[in-house]
């Protein structure tokens, strides 16, 4: 399934810009999408990472948040695959 994982790079965005971009991607995610991988980076601080984890924990479209081995990436799991 080519569309099963969507990626969104929010490097350099403000928290407001990043939230707007993430919300738009979540709205457009089709039924074949089970994961939104957000690339936020970590060398410039944790503001974006912290915002993602705070704002999307408990979001109606997000089943859970996964933190991988790469500290600059957070996955929003939309459904189980």
Task: Annotate each language-model stretch with its function.
Residues 1-81:
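Long, charged, low-complexity intrinsically disordered regions
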